[in-house]
């Protein structure tokens, strides 16, 4: 076993060697390096063929028509294109958008920008299990609502929203529905024919593909119109200009093809690893599982260790790569906005760690990590006066701390 151990697969995944191999074939002078938009010679034709093959592979994972896949630089851009593209195109119809408080920053920050432009956004508060229900969405719908944007799987706590039920509701009301599927692709079965979804964002680097490439599914039936946010050449049917990076597209296609073949078996293996890890840490007192106990992906286990500061626990686990909060916000000292929205108090939010397991995680690594977590938590609690008070039966929440 090699140290350090990587248990932060929800932040990013390493590229699968099979994917890297395919990508390498599109880089050098004797490879498929042409510009897919070059229509006048074989180098361009071959590159275009590779791009269209990748498009088909992504479409097949989600049961879409390849013509419904638009290449982007990643899920952040896909989210931006979906929200801004719909808002700007349909603004004469209405200016109200619905999302939730626990979305990824790529959706929340885009929604804030649209508010500055005069759109009105309702931010739904999920249940403490991290799930947004169809009833919550229905209660927020108005005559001028043009878009609902919700994630499929939450990146911090792994809870799974009932996209099918929400899609039935939005479709029956004639409201467009965008889903951020960055954390669900390759983990949860997605069939856009069954899910009444109009737009769906994907990223390659969460599915053992390269960083810097993603896709947006844009439904053709019923047809969704978007206003582009990047101009210059009219690539991707005018929705997203810019020379297509053949090597990255080939990588994303291969990664999604592997996910389609191996997802079922991989989910069983990862659930076993996650259960194995949890069993070994579950004897710790004051341990809380964040998010839904039932509707969750096994890849993500977000735990709060009460009376332990999350940052100090991270420092103690120097040979284990995990995160507190999501990778995009964990540089700030604020407690996780997701956990706060689930009703966790500041202490529990600050004491949370996200463990995420993946394709290359082994039983040996999981056992070592669990053992180190138990050691670190017990050691940090020994140093904590609050832990002593808790053990003595003092209700810490009732203490009035004196200000200096």
Swiss-Prot record:
The keyword Transmembrane helix does not apply. SUPFAM superfamilies: PLP-dependent transferases (SSF53383). [2Fe-2S] cluster binds at residue 328. Its main location: cytoplasm. Its cofactor is pyridoxal 5'-phosphate. Pyridoxal 5'-phosphate binds at residues 75-76, 155, 183, 203-205, 243. Pathway: Cofactor biosynthesis; iron-sulfur cluster biosynthesis. Keywords: 2Fe-2S, Cytoplasm, Iron, Iron-sulfur, Metal-binding, Pyridoxal phosphate, Transferase. Gene3D superfamilies: Aspartate Aminotransferase, domain 1 (3.90.1150.10), Type I PLP-dependent aspartate aminotransferase-like (Major domain) (3.40.640.10). It is found in: Cytoplasm. GO terms for biological process: [2Fe-2S] cluster assembly. The modification N6-(pyridoxal phosphate)lysine is found at residue 206. InterPro entries: Aminotrans_V_dom, Aminotrans_V_PyrdxlP_BS, Cys_deSase_IscS, Cysteine_dSase, PyrdxlP-dep_Trfase, PyrdxlP-dep_Trfase_major, PyrdxlP-dep_Trfase_small. GO terms for molecular function: 2 iron, 2 sulfur cluster binding; cysteine desulfurase activity; metal ion binding; pyridoxal phosphate binding. The keyword Metal-binding applies. GO terms for cellular component: L-cysteine desulfurase complex. The active site is at 328 (cysteine persulfide intermediate). Master enzyme that delivers sulfur to a number of partners involved in Fe-S cluster assembly, tRNA modification or cofactor biosynthesis. Catalyzes the removal of elemental sulfur atoms from cysteine to produce alanine. Functions as a sulfur delivery protein for Fe-S cluster synthesis onto IscU, an Fe-S scaffold assembly protein, as well as other S acceptor proteins. Homodimer. Forms a heterotetramer with IscU, interacts with other sulfur acceptors. Belongs to the class-V pyridoxal-phosphate-dependent aminotransferase family. NifS/IscS subfamily. This is Cysteine desulfurase IscS. The gene is iscS.
């Amino acid at each position: 076993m090699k140290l350090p151990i990587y248990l932060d697969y929800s932040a990013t995944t390493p590229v699968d060697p099979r994917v890297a191999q395919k990508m390498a074939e599109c880089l050098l002078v004797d490879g498929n390096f042409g510009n897919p938009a070059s229509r006048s010679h074989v180098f361009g034709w071959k590159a275009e063929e590779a791009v269209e093959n990748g498009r088909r592979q992504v479409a097949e994972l989600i049961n879409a028509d390849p013509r419904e896949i638009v290449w982007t630089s990643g899920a952040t851009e896909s989210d931006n294109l979906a929200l801004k593209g719909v808002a700007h195109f349909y603004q004469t119809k209405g200016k109200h958008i619905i999302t939730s408080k626990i979305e990824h920053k790529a959706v929340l920050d885009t929604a804030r920008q649209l508010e500055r432009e005069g759109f009105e956004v309702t931010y739904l508060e999920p249940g403490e299990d991290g799930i947004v229900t169809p009833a919550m969405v229905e209660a927020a719908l108005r005559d001028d609502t043009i878009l609902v944007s919700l994630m499929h799987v939450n990146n911090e706590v792994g809870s799974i929203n009932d996209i099918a039920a929400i899609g039935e509701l939005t479709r029956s009301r004639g409201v467009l529905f965008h889903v951020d599927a960055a954390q669900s692709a390759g983990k949860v079965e997605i069939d856009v024919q069954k899910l009444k979804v109009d737009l769906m964002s994907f990223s390659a680097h969460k599915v053992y593909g390269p960083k810097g490439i993603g896709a947006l599914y844009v439904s053709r039936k019923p047809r969704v119109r978007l206003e582009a946010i990047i101009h210059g050449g009219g690539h991707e049917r005018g929705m997203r200009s810019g020379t297509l990076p053949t090597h990255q597209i080939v990588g994303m296609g291969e990664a999604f093809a592997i996910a389609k073949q191996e997802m079922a078996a991989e989910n069983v293996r990862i659930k076993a690893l996650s259960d194995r890890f949890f069993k070994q840490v579950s004897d710790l007192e004051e341990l809380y599982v964040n998010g839904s106990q039932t509707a969750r992906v096994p890849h993500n286990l977000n735990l709060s260790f009460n009376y332990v500061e999350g940052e100090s626990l991270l420092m103690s686990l120097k040979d284990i790569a995990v995160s507190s909060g999501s990778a995009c916000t964990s540089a700030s000292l604020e407690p996780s906005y997701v956990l706060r929205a689930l009703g966790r108090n500041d202490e529990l939010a600050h004491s949370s760690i996200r463990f995420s397991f993946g394709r290359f995680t082994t039983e040996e690594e999981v056992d070592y990590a669990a053992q180190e977590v138990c050691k670190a938590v017990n050691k940090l609690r020994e140093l904590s006066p609050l832990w002593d008070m808790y053990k003595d039966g003092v209700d810490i929440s009732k203490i009035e701390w004196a200000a200096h």
